[in-house]
Amino acid sequence: MEQYVIKGGRPLEGEVTIAGAKNAALGILAAAVMTNQEVTIENVPNVRDTRVLLQAIQGIGARVRYIDEHTVAICGGTINPNTNLCVDDEYIRKIRASYYLLGALLGKYNHSQVALPGGCDIGARPIDLHIKGFEALGAHVDIANGMISVEADELIGSHIYMDVISVGATINVMMAAVMADGKTTIENAAKEPHIVDVANFLNSMGANIKGAGTDVIRIRGVKSLHGTTYSIIPDQIEAGTFMVAAAATRGNVLIKNVIPTHLEAITSKLTDIGATVIEYDDSVRVMCNKRLKATNIKTLPYPGFPTDMQPQMAVTLALSNGTSIVTESIFENRFKYVAELSRMGAHIRVEGNTAILDGVETFTGANVAAPDLRAGAALVIAALVANDFSTVCDIKYIQRGYEKFDEKLRGLGALIEKVETDKEIQKFKLRVG
């Protein structure tokens, strides 16, 4: 079983380049099947989730061609619409974004069938908002035997109000509506940057979407979509993870290929606790040479503090001077890292959707397990700070969303290696001392 072995206590220093946004890529890759012409997508992150989704896209008959490690060409014209368009295999059930193929295939072919989605166990993420949106457009939805089936004689534009702000439902309904007859309005839409990116991608294919990035999205249906070449935006969560890692290890890191406006909530909190953040046109530098201050954080939909950065920021607050309060308002099961972090010496208690963190001077190396993607990244940051050696197992979760995470950290001076056996761990320990 692959795991990371890490010797902590070294500040991160140097430069790191951020990959394309995983959450944007998953929506864009799914939407690429909505035209019969070839689509070329650049800056695709080479992570497990995107690879699995591309396998599923090939599985329904689309042609997928890798131009290079981060560029892929997709042609949906080879899909046979007379099949049941069933997306079901052992891989697709492991990623939550499999449901984007529901909206994409429904929008193009008026029917699709996809396995119930998986992903990280961070709490209930029901698909009722997706279903409500599809039904408002005229589709019939059936759930049976672990599969979701959607079918419509014709999709008709509609007014859709999202009862709860949902990134996934906003993207899915937006895709389903782009070729519906008439106008669709999505109210209380999510505003995350990757929603804007998916909308921009669809517009580059000939869709007519306005208002993405606001809470009201307006879509005028078009007859068909055409091919395009499109580059995915940088990943704000990967960027934020390296920003926090730089601050936690008291380092000095230039984080390249970012959109600083997408990072404002993270930048604001890092500045509040005493780190220095310098913004450039497409990069940010994070510096810290002292113990940071405590603060309070509440996760909120964009442009608020992102839930996907809560575990990483909690690691930094667990090292701060004072008591911090972290309130999780998006997912109810996002404190699974607390037990693991406590093994490293953190003082954290959880009360409902709130964690109270009494800062400690440093962490002690320990053997810990990644419970999910972002918590896994947080535990790696903790291990980079800790005295002595740590191992982080179950890194399959981390590999879902971070490309070459260990390689990028080594480029910043971290002592980290991906290993599979106890013998390899011992060799690493002997080598680094």
Regions found by a protein language model. Give the residues of each.
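Short, structured segments at the rim of ligand-binding sites
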Residues: 1-433
